[in-house]
Amino acid sequence: RNDYKDLIEMYEKNKKANKDQPQFFFNVTMQNHGGFSNNKVRFDEPVKITNFKAVQALDNYVSLMRTSDTALKDLIGYFKKVDEPVIILFYGDHQPSFSDDATKQLNEHSLYKSDNDKRLSKFVVPYFIWANYDIPEYDGMHDGGLTGEYNTVSVNYLASILLKYSGVELSDYDKYLLNLHQYIPAMSALGYWDGNGKRLFSTHITKPQASEFGAATRHKQKKVDEKKAEKLKRGYENVQYNLIFDAKDKLWDIFLPRKEDNK
């Protein structure tokens, strides 16, 4: 909550000093990163798990989630009332790590049976984009499954999606990523999703090992061009190398908006 208060204060200070300048904040909070075993923590609105006997760490974590939800509601409530366009992207990078006792209890109630799926579930997190003006709406938390163009996505695509919804001019790199997302919606060290929303744990696209993790999705089945997907994946590896390591021959015109767009 204090983190969001600081963010609002910075926003108001910058707006007062530079009225016509847009603002961008990349705000990282460690609110719910752990540990969770402290039994002396006192919450204004504590939450207690009742459908199974939980250790203190799990009760503390869900109480922290409630506290964070309240703070987020207040943050959005503030920006609903400002007199200029505001867009917020909210996401996390992984599920929390618990003590061995808490992890054992969670595994007993897990929806995922295989070790691969349990590992993967630690990196499946919700995200949302909110704006105080009209943008295309899709509520993946309520609609469920992997339905929706941007409900299956990895972090490498989020910046381009945010820029798209912001209505700003996209760089060639952003357009490239949005196109790549159609064929490989999400990717990680554990594998990737294919175009039908099915999780594949192999990193070799032409001979994937399918997982049941995505079996319950409501994607309409479509023919996946595996050769094209493989070509796109290898091309993306080259683009990443140029962006991160190739200082001498970096293709700045690809990664930045065109000069004429900035006039």
Which residue stretches match the model-derived regions?
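Solvent-exposed soluble domains appended to multi-pass membrane proteins
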Residues: 1-263
